[in-house]
Amino acid sequence: MTPLKIGACLAPHEIADHRDWLFDASRDLELQGFSLHHDLTTEFEDRIAAAKSALDGFNGRIGMHGPYEGLDMDNKDPELRPLITARFLKALEAAERVGARQMVLHSPFTRWYAWNRLNKPSYWEEKLARIHDVMTPVVKAAETAGVTLVIENIFDVDPATRRAMVDSFESDAIALSIDTGHAHLARRMSGAPPVDYFARDAGNQLRHVHLQDLDGHADRHWAPGEGEIHWAEVFRALAECTSEPHLVLELRRKSDIPQGFAYLKGLGLVE
């Protein structure tokens, strides 16, 4: 199996600490710091400027994490849905301006949905209609901007559900993201399949992966090797994917990036 090149998720002010590792090999880089209200309002221009400065001379692939807290794309209140759309569109503007080719958004699917989807007539159809109400303008804007929206699993139990949602837009501007830790936590909490199954189910809709480890109790965002995930099988599944997803370490302690990279490199999985 050929080792895969990986990068990391960092806020602009954190990039300098990992500059040589990221820049010399043109690794994948996901910008963080564009998800909160003040990031996209009062501090918007300052954050754009800081990101552009930190990225000067960078030739790798750039992504950005979009907003998520309180912004469920399946909001049942029709007066609130346009506000969520507007917030996503503002984040998309930031992604375009900093040169990102991807923007991460969170999945609206939960354990409750997985266990109740056949318990209510038209549950899937009604949920999907609300999602389209919020997301159709964002997907169309992403098409124009040349940015791919990648939908990250959070509480997802059945990866096929999120894939069906993405497929329903019939657009290259929306695809799938996997967070390895979230997938493993869903396995522990909700009986979801293992992480490699999430990757294999996504197939060539997979465009982005958050690499993080955990103990199955909480969303730890530990360095690979510190938790329970079976990394060899995860990377076997990723190696089968021909869509060349962005692969980024998303760690709670950015100082652990070298440790996580060294662990995976020692297994012969990354370069």
Give the positions of each predicted feature:
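Histidine-acidic metal/acid-base catalytic patches
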Residues: 1-5, 14-27, 73-74, 101, ...
